[in-house]
């Protein structure tokens, strides 16, 4: 699909299979989500710009490339997005963090916003929005709408699973935002869940129903 990158690294696919299993425990699911987020982050940040810095090694002075982490924002769609956030911050601890509170009304399947906090200068930063599931796309669309209202324009979206319906809706709303995912699954069921999916990522991560 145009504008969509499927991250098919063997380690990503292996860990995703274990996460899909219904017998995988809450603790294991949480650990695997953190591990897989590190691998996904590696791919979504592959083309980040580096600057040169003069450093001293134990032997001599040299010019060496370094990442400008302060120009990067990880935006987590609460609450499940936080599961991806932790592993990504392990890789880029200097990145800024945004939290966007959006939940899906299970009757209407429409997003309900309840919280938004982001750096004031989002217009000057690369924003990587994270949410494990791109189902209908409504929550992620609403989150990115909010970021764009604040001036953000350099945005990427990272998820673990995506449904074709969600991708179509998302790309129609935000054709300028590339999508990175570990898998494009078959379809949405009548309740708006990704099939075959892995269940509700937030519930499985936190042990709630």
Swiss-Prot record:
GO terms for molecular function: GTP binding; magnesium ion binding; uracil phosphoribosyltransferase activity. Pathway: Pyrimidine metabolism; UMP biosynthesis via salvage pathway; UMP from uracil: step 1/1. It is an enzyme of class 2 (transferase). Uracil binds at residues 194, 199-201. SUPFAM superfamilies: PRTase-like. It catalyses: UMP + diphosphate = 5-phospho-alpha-D-ribose 1-diphosphate + uracil. Pfam families: UPRTase. Keywords: Allosteric enzyme, Glycosyltransferase, GTP-binding, Magnesium, Nucleotide-binding, Transferase. Allosterically activated by GTP. 5-phospho-alpha-D-ribose 1-diphosphate binds at residues 79, 104, 131-139, 200. Its cofactor is Mg(2+). Its EC number is 2.4.2.9. GO terms for biological process: UMP salvage; uracil salvage. Gene3D superfamilies: 3.40.50.2020. Binds 1 Mg(2+) ion per subunit. The magnesium is bound as Mg-PRPP. The keyword Glycosyltransferase applies. It comes from the Bacteria. HAMAP family: Upp_B. Catalyzes the conversion of uracil and 5-phospho-alpha-D-ribose 1-diphosphate (PRPP) to UMP and diphosphate. Belongs to the UPRTase family. This is Uracil phosphoribosyltransferase. The gene is upp.
């Amino acid at each position: 699909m145009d504008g969509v990158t499927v991250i098919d690294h063997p380690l990503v696919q292996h860990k995703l299979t274990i996460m899909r299993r219904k017998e995988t425990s809450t603790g294991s699911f949480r650990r695997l989500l953190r591990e897989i987020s590190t691998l996904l982050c590696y791919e979504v940040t592959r083309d980040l710009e580096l600057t040169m810095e003069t450093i001293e090694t134990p032997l001599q002075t040299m010019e060496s490339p370094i990442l400008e982490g302060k120009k990067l924002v990880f935006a987590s769609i609460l609450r499940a997005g936080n599961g991806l956030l932790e592993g990504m911050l392990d890789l880029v601890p200097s990145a800024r963090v945004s939290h966007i509170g959006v939940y899906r009304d299970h009757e209407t399947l429409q997003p309900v916003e309840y919280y938004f906090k982001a750096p004031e200068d989002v217009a000057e930063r690369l924003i990587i929005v994270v949410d494990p599931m791109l189902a209908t796309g409504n929550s992620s669309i609403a989150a990115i709408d909010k970021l764009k209202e604040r001036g953000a324009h350099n945005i990427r979206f990272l998820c673990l699973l995506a449904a074709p319906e969600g991708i179509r809706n998302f790309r129609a709303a935000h054709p300028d935002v590339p999508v990175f995912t570990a898998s494009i699954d078959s379809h949405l069921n009548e309740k708006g869940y990704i099939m075959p999916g892995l269940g509700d990522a937030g519930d499985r991560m936190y042990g709630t129903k």
